[in-house]
Amino acid sequence: SMPMECISINKEGIMLYQDKKGYEDYWRKHQVSPIARDIWSYTPGKTPVYQKQTTFGGEDREPVWAPDGKSFYYLSEEKGSFNIFQRTPGANTSKQITFHTKHPVRFLSMASEGKLCYGYNGEIYTLVPGGQPQKVNITILSDKIDKDIIRQIRSYGATDIAVSPKGKEVAFIMRGDVYVLSLIHIS
């Protein structure tokens, strides 16, 4: 079996994927080691062809084909923090597309018309190649109508107290709610 992650297939059926040589925490930053992920291509056929697309000693991840299938985008720490890069299959060089600093770019995806989408520092961004990243304004509305639970520890105020026939439980009412408490397993 071939450990493949983040697979992207172009119209000709050529597959891009990131390899997985071993376990390393996916959230770890600036990891340079022999098990760092690389981008590979797989061309199916009578004689399948596997070709390593990236050579950086650190992490290269999450490849996505450009809509024309002639180049691809991926995340790399090649220039410091994770950013988006573009590369032509078989090329020795790549072009840096985003230039974020301090925090890593994560979760790269692409729409069919070529708009990139990714996460950066807890926000979602889109980018039309050749343009500038645009932060997506997101408003979260809640239809929650329940009141928040307020935890209260009380040592008085119980009413209507009753002990079970075997004496192992006690039931009581406090502030209109009925509670049953084990007298054997008190916590």
Spans of features found by a protein language model:
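A flexible loop/linker signature enriched in serine peptidases of the S9 family
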Residues: 1-8, 13-40, 44-61, 67, ...
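Loop/turn segments within WD40 beta-propeller blades
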Residues: 110-112, 163-166
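Signature of short aromatic-glycine-proline-rich micro-motifs recurring in repeat-based ectodomains
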Residues: 153-162
